[in-house]
């Protein structure tokens, strides 16, 4: 993912906020945890995630994003909403590092599905289960923000067009906002 704006900053400086994309959010886990039933395995994919009973997450190890990451709020909401007590939490700095740890079976993790490109297609298919949870979002908007009065407006508009026309369409599981 390029980034996300999950909170609109409250400040004296007027901002222009332009939505540019929507990215899929998934809970991913190594197949060894058995979160997706055998009869659902054939169809389980980032395009067809399994609706998971949150109780199955009790006492599992988690890969947690740092508080500065937009996914941290989703992680905290999940813990609070379902009363989940992780067996352990590994806090990572980079979501792709967390995905590699998840792939090795060290925990379950919320991700933007766009980062799945960082592991092989074979690992995506054979190693990981893909889930969504009731009452939690399965996507999030991404926006670009800039100061209303800036001399860089032509450059910003050009950058937004490049993002929408060249970069975002090449990201997995991410939709351009018209």
What are these regions (language model features)?
Residues 18, 55, 99-100:
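Alpha-helical segments flanking ligand/cofactor-binding loops in enzyme cores
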Residues 15-16, 47, 51, 129-133:
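Short beta-strand/turn micro-motifs at beta-sheet edges
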Residues 1-31, 36-40, 119, 129:
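Short beta-strand-centered segments that line the small-molecule binding cleft or hinge
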